[in-house]
Swiss-Prot record:
UniProt-annotated stretches for the region Disordered: 1-20
Organism of provenance: Mesorhizobium japonicum (strain LMG 29417 / CECT 9101 / MAFF 303099) (Mesorhizobium loti (strain MAFF 303099))
InterPro entries, per the entry: Formyl_transferase-like_C_sf, MPG, MPG_sf
Family: Belongs to the DNA glycosylase MPG family.
GO biological process, one term: base-excision repair
Keyword DNA damage attached: yes
Record field: transmembrane: none
Identification of the protein by name: Putative 3-methyladenine DNA glycosylase
UniProt xrefs under CDD domains: AAG
EC number in record: 3.2.2.-
Amino acid sequence: MGRAHTVSRGEDHPPIARSELPDDTAALARYLIGKLVVRDLPEGMVSGRIVETEAYVVGDAAGHGFRGMTPRNRSLFLERGHAYVYLAYGVSMMLNVSSEVPGIGTGVLIRALEPLDGIEIMRRNRGVERLRDLARGPGRLAAALRIDRSLDGLDLCRKGPLWLAKDNQKPGEIGQSTRIGITKDAARLLRFYVRGSLFVSGPRSLQE
């Protein structure tokens, strides 16, 4: 059985201090489970609880930083806690968090959120009603929060248009698996998720 869905009361969400973020990519991916992504939009605040992440570590052939820095991926090489936003397959934006010291191109992909604040705004952004489907998967998540390339390089440890925040609830049991849709370094157990959450993406076999 999954955890009961709980809606934030819209309280102020202070950003996470950078010093609290682990400086190891896999550790950061696990740490971010249960934390909040907060988006400040003209219509109001939107937020969600992180229920699924993937780590892309040093020497990882599946990572965007594997072959070095380029104009497209330079935000991945910033100090941990910055946004790396890119367009995947010409279709969907992807939100990542840079994860180590400056110059090391590693990051954590935020794969899924449990919607909290601004659910009606998310529904309009996504054009769907079903709560479970608003931010279940990285492309849906980005659409629900209206993530675009203008946010690339943003410091997520400071309040602004987008930031990371703590939550006052424990996330539940955290599972670990191989990453989704990866063909290089595919055997690594670098995906983290809340077991039994209705808001986790991927096949059922990777949700338990």
